[in-house]
Amino acid sequence: MTTDD
Protein backbone atom coordinates (compact mmCIF):
# COMPACT_ATOMS: atom_id res chain seq x y z
CA MET A 1 0.00 0.00 0.00
CA THR A 2 1.27 3.47 -0.85
CA THR A 3 0.15 6.80 0.53
CA ASP A 4 0.72 10.13 -1.19
CA ASP A 5 -0.09 13.48 0.39
Curated annotation (Swiss-Prot):
Q: Which GO terms describe its cellular component?
A: cytoplasm
Q: Which GO terms describe its molecular function?
A: adenosylmethionine-8-amino-7-oxononanoate transaminase activity
Domain of life, per lineage: Bacteria
Q: What are the record keywords, sorted? A: Aminotransferase, Biotin biosynthesis, Cytoplasm, Pyridoxal phosphate, S-adenosyl-L-methionine, Transferase
Q: Output one GO BP term.
A: biotin biosynthetic process
Give the metabolic or biological pathway: Cofactor biosynthesis; biotin biosynthesis; 7,8-diaminononanoate from 8-amino-7-oxononanoate (SAM route): step 1/1
- Provide the coiled-coil residue spans: none
Please give the catalytic activity noted in the UniProt record. (8S)-8-amino-7-oxononanoate + S-adenosyl-L-methionine = S-adenosyl-4-methylsulfanyl-2-oxobutanoate + (7R,8S)-7,8-diammoniononanoate
EC number(s) stated in the UniProt entry for this protein: 2.6.1.62
Is Cell inner membrane one of the keywords? no
Give compartment(s). Answer: Cytoplasm
Q: Which cofactor does it need?
A: pyridoxal 5'-phosphate
Please give the chief subcellular localization of this protein.
Answer: cytoplasm
Q: How does it assemble?
A: Homodimer.
> What is the documented function of this protein?
Catalyzes the transfer of the alpha-amino group from S-adenosyl-L-methionine (SAM) to 7-keto-8-aminopelargonic acid (KAPA) to form 7,8-diaminopelargonic acid (DAPA). It is the only aminotransferase known to utilize SAM as an amino donor.
Family to which this protein belongs: Belongs to the class-III pyridoxal-phosphate-dependent aminotransferase family. BioA subfamily.
Could you tell me what this protein is called? Adenosylmethionine-8-amino-7-oxononanoate aminotransferase
The gene from which this protein is expressed is bioA
